Amino acid sequence: MSAIENFDAHTPMMQQYLRLKAQHPEILLFYRMGDFYELFYDDAKRASQLLDISLTKRGASAGEPIPMAGIPYHAVENYLAKLVNQGESVAICEQIGDPATSKGPVERKVVRIVTPGTISDEALLQERQDNLLAAIWQDSKGFGYATLDISSGRFRLSEPADRETMAAELQRTNPAELLYAEDFAEMSLIEGRRGLRRRPLWEFEIDTARQQLNLQFGTRDLVGFGVENAPRGLCAAGCLLQYAKDTQRTTLPHIRSITMEREQDSIIMDAATRRNLEITQNLAGGAENTLASVLDCTVTPMGSRMLKRWLHMPVRDTRVLLERQQTIGALQDFTAGLQPVLRQVGDLERILARLALRTARPRDLARMRHAFQQLPELRAQLETVDSAPVQALREKMGEFAELRDLLERAIIDTPPVLVRDGGVIASGYNEELDEWRALADGATDYLERLEVRERERTGLDTLKVGFNAVHGYYIQISRGQSHLAPINYMRRQTLKNAERYIIPELKEYEDKVLTSKGKALALEKQLYEELFDLLLPHLEALQQSASALAELDVLVNLAERAYTLNYTCPTFIDKPGIRITEGRHPVVEQVLNEPFIANPLNLSPQRRMLIITGPNMGGKSTYMRQTALIALMAYIGSYVPAQKVEIGPIDRIFTRVGAADDLASGRSTFMVEMTETANILHNATEYSLVLMDEIGRGTSTYDGLSLAWACAENLANKIKALTLFATHYFELTQLPEKMEDVANVHLDALEHGDTIAFMHSVQDGAASKSYGLAVAALAGVPKEVIKRARQKLRELESISPNAAATQVDGTQMSLLSVPEETSPAVEALENLDPDSLTPRQALEWIYRLKSLV
């Protein structure tokens, strides 16, 4: 806002505004004035641009016109949604005083702050995506990271050890709002993100954090949560919790615990891997043709969000995985009956969060009632399922018959949007409310009786009784008969063709009705708040029920997907390895218009690396990605697209597949590729699954081949990771001759004249040729260019007929033994005529040559 030099020069209302704005200088302030929220000064200018609304001026204050923009209060949610989507935060300032009794400006205060990471309103949230508030902290030992989903109460912290792991966490969680300390060093990690909030250092103090968290959970220490020895994570969590409390302006009873996320509990995937595998987002940034788009046929929003969390955090605990597999198997015959009932449950998780924040609307309570009404049917269907995990879920679900009965008695079948609209509480629930309503609702009968009586008394056939919001109740007589109005009729309003009157009896009744309506609405609001008080003691059990219902939705969905898409149950083995019979790519097989060619895969301690060759477009990348996706699906407990799968322990999945220039960071394609490769070579273990596609293609042939050879050698000999290594360097097909746990496979193709047929079938052994020219022809490269390329290829092959079979290893690499570039000093000496030099010139040349060496 513009600097205001003389505060006292402003009107009292603007002084009130400026005081409130000074408390929230960084964010937009919606200042309630009657039926509008107004914005002033710089806020008005920003809002007019962000929301595409008119920028006007309001009179003058301190001698200057005031820039102003406004939005109607009844449409505020739409405008808030637009601002939140742009990463903006808004302070909502309401009138809390009574205009009738106020001297000077009506009392106002900020009642809530809407920020991208703390929204819980249904209209502002993406229903099938988590909306996370996060905080990041860094010290000399690493990072601390905490996330909170305020719409469910899910509170997590972790301590990423290095920059790569931290980047992967940001990619996985994708927070809507991120808090960071004012001295945060790694700004390049978070630059460009929406919803960045710079916070003072003291908010990250460890002692303050412990105090805040213990106060929130009602505990003396944090040992029971397993986070006591995570100081960096606690620093982030403390700042995050304080921010959530500051913005919500209320208690947060649904946040009742915090969980530590440890690397060893889940399969680690870095940011590049999540991007390349297109788990929930494709490479173009959309949701189409992703793994989630195939697997997610859940029928509740909370189930959809849980499935996506599973996909981004595959678990390594085989006990949990076997339990999920057993449940999916047991539910396969019940999906048709369960899914229609589950669909009626809706988003109970987020409704409960709004209940906890006391912002639940009447329709939220109606939906909660509807969810409770489904529980008996769900429990009855699940009773016959022979599975201990299913029965455990059934118990967690509960019944809540008393709460269902309460809401059936208290809330009408189809309530209005807001409690202030009235008519929310059902008749029969409260005797006093029914009496006030009867008085208000009896107005129609009274007015009809009054109209009949007055017509008979006056003999005026145009007389009628009515009501409008401005003038209240009135008796109307046409202009032609108005001169006959009785003497006790007092004129209230003159119209073109009629006169309107009031009589003492009608005025008295009007006061009585308006009083009864006001009292009914006030009592209704009070009863509505009391409903929160009756429901909130059950919040913990209700949250457990919502979690169980979401998990049931996910497992029923995976059972349906397994049956519909012909998936099989994978087997977990103790030793590293992956054996797949007739494996398929879960996404590609759904979008193809022709049958998908299934392929086998065998990786074991004796066969740790496959060198994959074959033509471009032959299916190398698909084959590699399908292996990673099958492994990922197995480790969320899902069935997988194959005839049979045996899979050993996996700690990490890495992919180095494709690359593009990172223009924002000034990194070339090759630099991006090498950075990702370095991350793999530093962090992969013998239990990692590594996908390497076309390493070294971003530089010269010799450099690229050298790097590809050395990387393959390191992965096979030193790291011993389970590796799929696709390459166009045929020299690498000699690796199996030098290393016993490396094997060649290739994708088959048939060439006939200028055409090529991709068989998409994986065969043992190396590919016989590259088919590059045939693929170029298929892509539409002009025939004269293809013809010239064939001619050039024959020339090159005649010069080096055995290029593909050249020995390339650590001691002898004839293909790489290219002549070194001539030194500038040698070139200078060759061009020098010593006989023509004077002694002085000879001395100068010695110094010059010295500088060239």
Swiss-Prot record:
Disulfide bonds: none annotated. Gene3D superfamilies: 1.10.1420.10, 6.10.140.430, DNA repair protein MutS, domain I, MutS, connector domain, P-loop containing nucleotide triphosphate hydrolases. Keywords: ATP-binding, DNA damage, DNA repair, DNA-binding, Nucleotide-binding. HAMAP family: MutS. This protein is involved in the repair of mismatches in DNA. It is possible that it carries out the mismatch recognition step. This protein has a weak ATPase activity. Belongs to the DNA mismatch repair MutS family. This is DNA mismatch repair protein MutS. It comes from Shigella boydii serotype 18 (strain CDC 3083-94 / BS512). The gene is mutS.
